Amino acid sequence: LIGGAARRYTCEMQDRNLALEVVRITEAAALASARLMGRGDRKLADHVAVEAMRVAFDAMDIRGTVVIGEGERDEAPMLFIGERVGAGWRAGASDSPKVDIAVDPLEGTNLCATGAPDAISVIAIADDGQFLNAPDTYMQKIAVGPEARHVIDLRESATWNLERIAKAKGKKIQDCTAVILDRDRHSELIGEVRQAGARIRLIGDGDVSGAVMTANPDSGIDVLFGTGGAPEGVIAAAALKCVGGELQGRLRFRSDDERARAVRMGVKGEDTIYSTDELARGDVMFAATGVTKGYLLDGVRFFGDSAKTESIVMRSKTGTVRVINATHHFNTKPKYSWATGLEP
C-alpha cells in the first residue's frame, strides 16, 4: 500500500511539474515573436516563435510527438506533424511521459505584425494518442463557457443557439456577445446574429483566444461562432475542457485533395459533429502566453535587460487555472532564438 501510494504521489507530482513546465515553452515563443510586434513581417514573427519553441522543448523531460503543428514534414522545418520533441527521446528515458503535442507558436501572425491585440503563443498536451489528428482544413465551430455547456448544437442556427445560451446564463439575447472571425464567408452568420439582437466582437485572427474568452466572465464574451482552422479547433477544445466549457466542431473541406487527405488520416467526414471530448480525450493541459496586449492576456513588455510576460496554465484533471506573471532577465535566461536583429 505504501509503495502504491508513493507511486501515485510521484505520478501526481510529475503531472504538476509538467503542467508548470509547459508555460516555459509558450513564454519562449512569445518573447521571441514580441520583438517583431508591429514591424510588418508576419512570416519572420512566426519563424522566430517556431524556432524558440522548438529549442525550448529540448529542455523539457518528455517524449512528445507533434500531432498539430506547423504542417507536414515537407512543409515545415520544425514542429512538423510527427516530429519528436523533448529531452526524453534523446536520453532514452522510458520513465519520461509519452505525450501528444498540439502547438501554435504564434496564433495571430497578422496581429503581431500589425501590433493588433490578442496575438498569443499556445500549447496543449495530452496522453499519447488522445488528440484528434485534425487535417489542415477548415472547421465550423461553436464554443461556450461552463454555464452554457450542454445546451448548444452546431446543427442548429445561430439564433437557436443564442436563445439557449441566453436562457442558460440568465440573460437576454441583447445582453449576449458573440465573437466571430471577420471574414467574407461569415457575412450571413454576422447578419443573423445581428438580427437576433446579440452584440458582436469581430476579430481579425485568433479563434483559439476567442474560444477561451467564452469561459472567462470578465471578457464579456458568451459564444464563439464561425469557421476557422481545424487544428486550432483541437487546441481550443483542449483549453475549454480544462475549465468545463464546450466546443463542437465539424470539418469543412476546401478541395478534394483536403478531403482525400483526411481520409488517409482516418478522420471522419463533413457530416460528423465532434464533441469536446472527441477532439481532446483524457487528461489535457493547456498553456498560453500573451504576445500583444489583448482581452485574454497582457502582451510582452520589454525593459531593456528584462521583460515581463503574462500566461495562463490550465489542467483538465483538476480544473486548476493559474495566471502566471513572470519577469525574465536576459543576462541569465537561455537564448531561444538566434534570428538576426532580435538580440535584447
Question: For each predicted feature, which ranges?
Answer:
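Solvent-exposed alpha-helices and their adjacent loops that cap or buttress functional pockets
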Residues: 58-59, 85-96, 104, 112-116, ...
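N-terminal subdomain of lithium-sensitive/metallo-dependent phosphomonoesterases centered on the IMPase/IPPase/PAP
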Residues: 9-102, 167, 208, 282, ...
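Acidic beta-strand-loop-alpha-helix segment within the catalytic core
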Residues: 122-203, 265-266, 294-295, 299-301, ...
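Short, low-complexity intrinsically disordered segments enriched in A/P/G/S/L with frequent Arg
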Residues: 3-7
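Short acidic, glycine/serine/threonine-rich loops at helix termini
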Residues: 78-80, 113-116, 134-137, 189-194, ...
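Helical "lid/coupling" subdomains associated with nucleotide-phosphate turnover
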Residues: 204, 213-218, 223-344
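General beta-strand structural signal in soluble alpha/beta enzymes
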Residues: 66-70, 101-103, 112-114, 133-134, ...
